[in-house]
C-alpha cells in the first residue's frame, strides 16, 4: 500500500508520516528532503540555482539514503549525514527554487518512484498524490495558515537551539508558498481524491483513517 501525504511546508506532514511509518512498519519517503539534498549539493558545488540543465545533471547523480537511527530517519548524501544541514533556511529556500524546474523534477521522479518497491510506503511531499504516485491507495492533504506554520517552525528551531527570526520565517514561508502553488510544473494542490486536514485536525484521527477502509469525520474531500 502507498499512502501519500501532501501539503505546504510546516503543516505537520513530517510528524504524521514518521508516526505512520513507525506504526505500520512502512518505508518512509520524504520528497522534500530529496529536493533539499539537491539544493544543498548545488550550494556546496556552487551550481547556479537558475541553471536548469546543470541542476538536473546534478540531481541525476545524487547518492541519497534514508536510514532509520535512534528513533528518527537520518538522511545521507554520498555517505555523509546531512540531516541537520538540509534543515537550514538557506537550503529550504534554495530547494523551493530548484523544485520549479521540469528537468530537475524529472531527474528526481524515478528516484522517488523506486521507493514504491517496498511492501508499504508513506510518501511525504508536495506532489506525491498528484504526480509521483497518482494511483496511491490513500491520499491525504495537510494544510494550515502561513502564520500557524511559521509559529511551528519557530518553535522547532528553538527546540534545536537554533536562533530564528519569526518575521523572517513568516515572510519566507509566504514566498515559498507562492512559488510552490504557482509554479507551472507540479504545483502544490490537493489531489482530486485526497482527504483534506487542517493543522488543528486530530492527528490520531488522521492516522486512524489511513489504516482503515473508511474516512473519519475529521477530514473532508478536497
UniProtKB/Swiss-Prot annotation:
Its EC number is 2.7.4.25. Keywords: ATP-binding, Cytoplasm, Kinase, Nucleotide-binding, Transferase. Transmembrane segments: none annotated. It comes from the Bacteria. This is Cytidylate kinase 2. Pfam families: Cytidylate_kin. GO terms for cellular component: cytosol. The gene is cmk2. ATP binds at residues 7-15. One of its GO terms (biological process) is pyrimidine nucleotide metabolic process. It is found in: Cytoplasm. The keyword Ribonucleoprotein does not apply. HAMAP family: Cytidyl_kinase_type1. InterPro entries: Cytidylate_kin, Cytidylate_kinase_dom, P-loop_NTPase. One of its GO terms (molecular function) is (d)CMP kinase activity. It catalyses: CMP + ATP = CDP + ADP; dCMP + ATP = dCDP + ADP. Belongs to the cytidylate kinase family. Type 1 subfamily.
Amino acid at each position: 500500500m502507498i499512502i501519500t501525504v501532501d501539503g505546504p511546508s510546516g503543516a505537520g506532514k513530517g510528524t504524521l508520516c514518521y508516526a505512520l511509518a513507525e506504526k505500520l512498519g512502512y518505508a518512509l519517503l520524504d520528497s522534500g528532503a530529496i529536493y533539499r539534498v539537491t539544493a544543498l549539493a548545488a550550494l556546496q558545488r556552487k551550481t547556479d540555482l537558475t541553471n536548469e540543465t546543470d541542476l538536473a545533471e546534478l540531481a541525476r547523480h545524487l547518492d541519497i539514503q534514508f536510514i532509520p537511527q535512534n528513533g528518527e530517519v537520518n538522511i545521507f548524501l554520498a555517505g555523509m549525514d546531512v540531516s541537520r544541514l538540509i534543515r537550514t533556511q538557506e537550503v529550504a529556500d534554495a530547494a523551493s527554487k530548484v523544485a520549479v524546474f521540469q528537468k530537475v523534477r524529472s531527474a528526481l521522479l524515478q528516484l522517488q518512484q523506486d521507493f514504491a518497491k517496498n511492501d508499504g510506503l508513506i510518501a511525504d511531499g508536495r506532489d506525491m498524490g498528484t504526480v509521483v504516485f497518482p494511483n496511491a491507495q490513500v491520499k491525504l492533504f495537510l494544510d494550515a495558515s502561513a502564520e500557524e506554520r511559521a509559529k511551528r517552525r519557530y518553535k522547532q528551531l528553538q527546540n534545536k537551539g537554533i536562533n530564528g527570526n519569526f518575521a523572517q520565517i513568516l515572510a519566507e514561508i509566504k514566498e515559498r508558498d507562492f512559488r510552490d502553488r504557482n509554479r507551472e510544473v507540479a504545483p502544490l494542490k490537493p489531489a482530486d481524491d485526497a482527504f483534506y486536514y487542517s493543522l488543528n485536525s486530530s492527528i490520531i484521527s488522521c492516522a486512524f483513517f489511513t489504516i482503515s477502509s473508511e474516512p473519519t469525520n475529521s477530514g473532508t474531500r478536497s
